[in-house]
Amino acid sequence: MTTFFQQHFSRNKWLAYAQLMRFDKPIGTLLLLHPTLWALFAAAGGMPPLSVLVIFVLGVIVMRAAGCVINDYADRHIDGEVKRTSQRPLATGRVTTTEAKILFVLLLCIAFVLDLLLNRYTFLLSFVAVALAIIYPFMKRFTHLPQVVLGMAFGWAIPMAYGAVSESLPLECWLLFFANIFWTVAYDTQYAMVDRDDDLRIGVKSTAILFAQYDNKIIALLQFITLVLLVIFGWISQYHWGYFVVLGLSASLFSHQCWLTKQRVREQCFKAFLNNHYFGLGVFFAILVGIYA
């Protein structure tokens, strides 16, 4: 029994579990949290019920962790071939495939309990979220557009938030949802640009490979479409003009990102990806200004 606990629950093992769930790299959680907060506050016309807010924040943390576990499980045979991912717990053997599968199921169970605390409408929508989380990691084997599926997975919290607050999915919900998809494809292409050389070598597909030398131009187009959808969203929602001012200021970050990725240097592309956290935060502030100003 002692050996069992030492093998599966030692301090080093807990650290490996935490790394597998990316607790040491919160950027993914933030990029999932921002659109969730957009939708919660937009649907409520202000502060959503505290219980709903807490459930969704916890749900973001849990589902982001689950997504990382299933992603690394799917990529366990190729992560070791990529410079950026070669030290991940499954790639190095610090976490076994059995441990990863058990952890994934436990995280889904926690998410299931959280969903039970919401209304039936939202509970039913949550099954789509789980399906997208499971499907996404395997898409890079079959299509150059896995980022689109990631955008759907990261954005599905938006209809869930509207469902939890209003039990309806109005036009505003879908404008935010599709804005988030275009934004996600843009920033995850920046992320994929970091690994492009490795991905080409091992045969992994991505939008960074698909877009090739047109990558920066297409990213700029995707960002422009994101902004157009967010402007339409604000107009339909009849937000205060301050929303559009803050949104415009946030949009200036896209210009900075284009400058960073211009030379396609790995480190600069990764900085551009990280910078999207501030854009997501800016949109959230814009919504608050639009509602309360």
From Swiss-Prot:
Membrane topology classification: Multi-pass membrane protein
Keywords of the record: Cell inner membrane, Cell membrane, Magnesium, Membrane, Transferase, Transmembrane, Transmembrane helix, Ubiquinone biosynthesis
GO annotation, biological process: ubiquinone biosynthetic process
Gene Ontology CC terms: plasma membrane
Record pathway: Cofactor biosynthesis; ubiquinone biosynthesis
Record-linked Gene3D superfamilies: UbiA prenyltransferase
Family affiliation: Belongs to the UbiA prenyltransferase family.
Protein name: 4-hydroxybenzoate octaprenyltransferase
Source species of the chain: Actinobacillus pleuropneumoniae serotype 5b (strain L20)
